[in-house]
Amino acid sequence: SNCDFTFKPCFLYTQDPRKVDYMADECKSRQAIGIHCELFTSETHQNEFSFNFEAGVYSHYGAAIINPVQFTRDLIEYNVKKGLQVFENTNIVDYNLSSRQSVLITEQEFTITADKVIICTGYDALEWFKHEKPFYTLSRRFAILTKPVENFHGWKEACIIRDDQDPYTYLRPTLSNSIIIGGEDLEIDDLDGEVANMGDRHPLALQQYHQLLRRVRRMFPQIENIKTDCWFHGLFVDTKDGLPFIGKHPDYPGAYFNLGYGSNGILYSLIGAKLISQDVAGKNPKELEIFKFNRY
């Protein structure tokens, strides 16, 4: 894929002096499995960053950035060449997911029948489970994209940065020398509530965007003229054990779900794609037990 994939170092840090030993242990654990990283402390490496920290793990090849739009296009095109059929503008408005054959009704009132349906619509899939007691927690995460900056002074190698808070704040550069910062999460108690359905210019959303801009300016005072270019927010779903939900649900026996909820959605989605493919092929992978619905 010509998606400008670029390896980047990453920095996980804490400002809590009580967590210095934890960061040291984390660094040793990463090194033990072959990850090229080192422990930074305020005494040894504070000059690498313009914001204060007590300790952190600096992984030299621990992350990467890509052009996600181009990657998605290339991925679809690659699979079309292998026989995948893609139907754009096909909104499903009704369904019957029986165990023998699944029937989907489109917005244009066409009928699609299939032996199996795989649902991997991310947070939108929660609509399928509104009748259940929630097995997840919801929050809304905010992010801003700045206008391109002239330099990254006070920011070692323009690495990807994440703090150790829960919820956490992250920062990363873009290929065009802009900055993305995300965080300032708001908890959601009700899918029909205000926070769950707010628009981009909701007063509370604007407040969170402003907080993010203030934070990046405080962290990097040597970077001049940091200004917001655009902003966005979205739902974030977590689970009690931090693991995704992959496989079949008892209410929808004609469907598979690949819901990469939790703290590692990209990896979970890849695992789900592999396991579901194996199950459809009749291989019955035992790992599906780990990610099943109704596990707690």
Regions found by a protein language model. Give the residues of each.
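Flavin (FAD/FMN) cofactor-binding and adjacent substrate-gating region
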Residues: 1-77
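A short, glycine/Asx- and small/polar-enriched loop/turn
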Residues: 18-21, 48-55, 96-103, 112, ...
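Short acidic/His/Gly/Ser-rich catalytic and metal-binding motifs that mark active-site loops
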Residues: 182, 188-193
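Flavin-binding catalytic cores
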Residues: 148-152, 193-232
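General small-molecule cofactor/ligand-binding pocket signal
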Residues: 38-40, 85-87, 226-229
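Helical element adjacent to the flavin cofactor pocket in flavoenzyme catalytic cores
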Residues: 28-29, 53, 57-116, 120
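C-terminal catalytic lobe of FAD-dependent flavoproteins
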Residues: 213-296
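Flavin-dependent oxidoreductases
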Residues: 94-180
